[in-house]
């Protein structure tokens, strides 16, 4: 009997993406699997049921959940959805286990193997599975457009019959995937751009996009592709340099975020007060508490002279292509764990080991387990059991 891979309809209020698009469904079938979709799952992202060829469209969600060997989703599913899955099944979705402990417990207790897409390791061979990066690319692009529509001026220089209009000054803070895409987009739209990141190795990437790089003299390169926490002295040094650049910017996009953790503060109230009238900040860290003082997630607020936009789930605003990229990320993961139509989980494989959050009734992610069971329990389990002597 073939493995059944099913995608569900997302229930989040601001979620329009779907985990499976028609083209990818065809490629999954080539792996020797049956493919099913909850009725209407792709409509919000411009994929009607009729676009899914040779896919079982099922209206009974409970039946779909109980029969699927592998369940695909975008957002962390509810506990109720997990409890409706059959024991031994696999979930592939974003999980954010440190923030969704009830979900992880349900996965553990239901003996569901949970793959957390946000935990895909940042290694070369896993790039095609890196859902955080694929979604961040679209968020970075859209952030500049969002900022532009809130500005009282245009981005490019423009020559008119009555004179020339100056190009806007755009500062991108945080040059990860989202930041670099924002930088490239602002440059293509004609703005004068500069980028800042605490990791000096991003300097060349900024220059390659036609942008200046803000030099602070602080190196905060951390592990896993993310920046480390700055010391108090380093923060003061960085602030002194950045304040001038912030004050002269027309548009700032902040992108500093680490999945599942509080967003670092990049801009404070004093710096905002010295910004130009009509200036705009788009804070991509809004869901994690904000990179800017005064940011409100899901709202646009006026703070002194500046408008602060705190968008949530920007990839969902570009649902058609966000779904396409995410679905391809999942396909590449499935190709790692399905061979000749059979499930083959290699626990020694770095991608599998680091992406798993639960398996066989256990929490396999140490970081998540520490939050749920406590550091003492994790440490105790690492101590070998004493061996009886004859």
Task: Locate the predicted segments by residue.
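An N-terminal-biased, well-structured beta-alpha scaffold segment characteristic
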Residues: 2-106
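Glycine/serine-rich phosphate-binding loop and adjoining beta1-alpha1 elements at the start
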Residues: 2-4, 10, 79-169
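Glycine-rich phosphate/diphosphate-binding loop of Rossmann-like nucleotide-binding domains
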Residues: 8-47, 156-247
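Glycine/threonine-rich flexible loop motifs
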Residues: 14-19, 80-85, 93, 225, ...
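Generic hydrophobic/aromatic pocket-lining and core-packing "Φ" positions
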Residues: 25, 49, 82, 104, ...
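A structured beta-alpha segment of the ubiquitous adenosine-cofactor-binding alpha/beta core
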Residues: 55-69, 76-77, 223-252, 256-273, ...
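Rossmann-fold NAD(P)-binding glycine/threonine-rich loop
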Residues: 98-124, 262-314
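Adenosine-phosphate binding glycine-rich loop
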Residues: 118-119, 124-161, 286, 292-386
């Amino acid at each position: 009997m073939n493995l059944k891979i099913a995608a569900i309809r997302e229930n989040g209020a601001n979620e329009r993406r779907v985990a499976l698009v028609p083209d990818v469904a065809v490629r999954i079938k080539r792996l020797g699997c049956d493919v099913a979709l909850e009725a209407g799952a792709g409509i919000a992202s411009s994929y009607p049921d009729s676009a899914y060829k040779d896919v079982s469209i099922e209206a009974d969600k409970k039946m779909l959940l109980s029969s699927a060997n592998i369940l695909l989703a975008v957002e962390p599913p509810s506990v109720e959805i997990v409890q409706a899955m059959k024991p031994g099944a696999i979930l592939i979705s974003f999980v954010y286990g440190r923030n969704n402990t009830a979900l992880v417990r349900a996965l553990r207790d239901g003996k569901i193997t949970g793959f957390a897409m946000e935990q895909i390791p940042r290694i070369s061979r896993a790039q095609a599975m890196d859902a955080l990066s694929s979604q961040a690319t679209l968020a970075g692009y859209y952030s500049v457009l969002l900022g532009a529509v809130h500005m009282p001026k245009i981005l490019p220089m423009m020559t008119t019959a009555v004179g020339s209009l100056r190009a806007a000054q755009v500062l991108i803070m945080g040059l990860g995937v989202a930041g670099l895409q924002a930088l490239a987009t602002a440059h293509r739209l004609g703005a004068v751009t500069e980028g800042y990141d605490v990791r000096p190795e991003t300097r060349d990437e900024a220059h390659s996009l036609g942008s200046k790089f803000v030099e602070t003299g602080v190196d905060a390169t951390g592990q896993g592709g993310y920046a480390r926490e700055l010391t108090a002295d380093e923060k003061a040094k960085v602030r002194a340099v950045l304040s001038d650049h912030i004050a002269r910017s027309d548009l700032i996009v902040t992108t500093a975020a680490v999945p599942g953790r509080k967003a670092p503060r990049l801009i404070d109230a004093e710096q905002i007060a010295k910004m130009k009238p009509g200036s705009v900040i788009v804070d991509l860290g809004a869901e994690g508490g904000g990179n800017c003082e005064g940011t409100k997630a899901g709202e646009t607020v006026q703070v002194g002279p500046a408008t602060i936009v705190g968008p949530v789930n920007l990839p969902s605003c570009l649902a058609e292509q966000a779904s396409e990229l995410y679905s391809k990320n999942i396909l590449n993961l499935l190709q790692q764990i399905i061979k000749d139509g059979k499930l083959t989980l290699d626990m020694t494989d770095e991608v599998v080991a680091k992406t798993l959050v639960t398996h066989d009734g256990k929490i396999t992610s140490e970081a998540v387990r520490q939050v749920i069971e406590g550091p003492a329990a994790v440490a105790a389990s690492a101590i070998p059991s004493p061996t009886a002597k004859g």
